[in-house]
Amino acid sequence: MASQSQVLVEEKSSVRILTLNRPKQLNALCFNMISRLLQLFRAYEEDPSVKLVILKGQGRAFCAGGDVPPVVQNMVQGKWRLGADFFRDQYTLNYVMATYSKPQVSILNGIVMGAGAGVSIHGRFRIATENTVFAMPETSLGLFPDVGASYFLSRLPGFFGEYVGLTGARLDGAELLACGLATHFVPSTRLTALETDLCKVGSSDPSFVSTILDAYTQHPHLKQKSAYHRLDVIDRCFSKRTMEEIISALERETTQELDDWSLTTIRALKKSSPSSLKISLRSIREGRLQGVGHCLTREYRMVCHVMKGDLSKDLVEGCRAILIDKDRNPKWEPRRLEDMKDSMVDQFFERVEEEERWEDLKLSPRNNLHALRIAAKL
């Protein structure tokens, strides 16, 4: 089966090592991979002989996101429900990971974007390295940070989550550790030794795993130009109520001090889909007050509207401009933030009405919900 070659499984004593294996596609998650991961995680949770699950990627990426082009192709052909099924399974997997009763260690030694964050950040342990590149670039594609991102981004220090989710800014391993998205930082040259020691774990008690990881972890310095050094500016600007106010605040910062970071941030926001920016901001803000299950259920409503194309076709246009034609010149609709009214935003958060057999995402209550460990290291 293709799914078995795309997710490799190693059994080492009481540890299971899963490797995402589509290196040419930067381990982008297709439907078969998501189904396979969901099957394996559920089986391991029921198997008393399994104490720890390690997840990593083959090649230079952990996982660069979901396999979006086939989903968009189905949208164009009017088969939006196939995309809805893809996201239903993906969000269910995210929920299982967020509520997993056994420790999961994700080794983020490379590119981590979009769906790659969904299969790692919800787990208890996230290992960054000097090769880590993290981003949530959905607003530049006409989508929104999903896979439970409204839950984990909203729990970052201050308004750093809004900054990361709205701009698609890239973070390195040191920044990931500093803001709490990573729990540990381990040099890539030490990963083989770390994995060997983790495979000696004979208990599902997270403290045993934590002790091993703590022995390997380092605390790298942030680069001088790191966005994390600008938390005061980020909080001042991204705490504003609306997207228009956020951009105005950033523009005021540039009048006081000409700064490449502010200009780059404004440019990224102005190139993104106005509808995506507005629904993303609201989603992250609502996530501050919601549990992970509630966030995923809400995001499923939102993504079904995107799949159906009844409220916006920006995902189709963004995919064309960024992934297919690569002219990087999407024609968003509406083109201006001020034309995306609050009443239009509201519709993304409502049920998909007038559709037979459509249902909200139903996530069964689980007793294992562990608080997401977002602990800033600075």
Swiss-Prot record:
Any matching Pfam family: ECH_2
Primary localization: other
Presence of keyword Plastid: no
Family under the similarity heading: Belongs to the enoyl-CoA hydratase/isomerase family.
GO biological process: valine catabolic process
SUPFAM superfamilies reported in the protein's UniProt record: ClpP/crotonase
GO cellular component terms given for this protein: peroxisome
Entry's localization field: Peroxisome
Catalytic activity, as annotated: 3-hydroxy-2-methylpropanoyl-CoA + H2O = 3-hydroxy-2-methylpropanoate + CoA + H(+)
EC number: 3.1.2.4
Annotated metabolic or biological route of this protein: Amino-acid degradation; L-valine degradation
MF GO annotations: 3-hydroxyisobutyryl-CoA hydrolase activity
Keywords in alphabetical order: Branched-chain amino acid catabolism, Hydrolase, Peroxisome
Protein name: Probable 3-hydroxyisobutyryl-CoA hydrolase 3
